[in-house]
Amino acid sequence: MTRIARCLNTPYHHAIVASLALATIGISRALAQDEDVVDPNNPAIGAEVLRLPGLQDLGRRSSGAQVEVLLALRFNHPDELQQLVWEQSDRNSRNYHRYLTSDQFAERFGPTLEQLERLTSELQQAGFQVTKTSSNRLLVHATAPAVTVENYFKTEIHSVRQDSNDDRYMNVKPALLPDALIPLVKAVHIDNLVVAKVGVRPDSITGPIQGPDNGFTPVALANSYSFPVQHGKDGKGHTAAIIIDSDILDSDLNAFFAFFPINRTGTITRESVDGGIIGSPSNGTDFRETALDTETIGGLAPGADIVIYVIPNLADVAINDAANQIISDKKAEVVNMSFGGGEKIGRAHV
């Protein structure tokens, strides 16, 4: 499972999260299962074809049916960015641990306003409606009829069924960027498939998985690993973010913290991204992962604030939007994403 973490008791550095998270958003299919891989060095390839188990192809999508696309713009000065990342980890460099704020990162390496305007103009002229742009100019959402998307990106879009009756669609041919977009766009997402899943599940052995005599308590973990909370550092003044597709009831969290007991002084708040449901569990049993993540962070850093970014599903678009909102909100120093899929598998080359 993917769990991104940094110690909550360390001095606060702006934008190590910003630079790393921004760098991952533009990469097409970080959570991909198995794709039709074409030449990875071809800048015209905006999106490959994602292969997921259990998909049922329902045929070509109606020409007038709406399709949402997400475009991730390229960073400026990529060589300079790569060098800076190396220097920030080099003890002999003057840039060692000298991190940028999210605003500094966006100004130095992010897309410019002129580049964003060029992209939105190209899309609008092609018949797209630009529905949202991120504050750091990195992500652009747009919608258009399927036939417009197919013609513009030289692809073919099919409707598919994926584990439910929700309306899902995907490109079944690689999507090609028009010449005008190649210098501006790193990747485009032309599907709304759920590409990740949580991993929490009941233990296969018999007996309860919770309670005073089963499993390790927060105190047991804190003592065994000599966590900072056992040395007077409870995370106060720091904030952790969780990206997940279900909320968890406060009553459940309160029961957990009261049982052990843990004196929580930090806050737990929610942010809805792309219509994620706040106030009740959603997406089947995924709330168990939310409970596990929130209780783990809240139990081992009781003074830290936690912001749960609730997304509607574990599709690429929602995951990227949540990561980008965390960067724009400038609250969290650490991000937890406890979900994942199979590694990307490409063709073997001799």
Residues covered by each model-derived region:
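Generic alpha-helical structural signal
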Residues: 2, 26-27, 286
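Bacterial N-terminal signal peptides that target proteins for export
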Residues: 2-17
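Bacterial N-terminal signal peptides
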Residues: 14-26
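Short hydrophobic "helix-edge" motifs at membrane interfaces and signal-peptide entry regions
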Residues: 18, 135-136
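Boundary at the C-terminal end of the N-terminal hydrophobic targeting segment
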Residues: 28-32
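Substrate-binding/charge-relay-adjacent region of secreted/lumenal peptidase catalytic domains
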Residues: 33-135, 141, 146-347
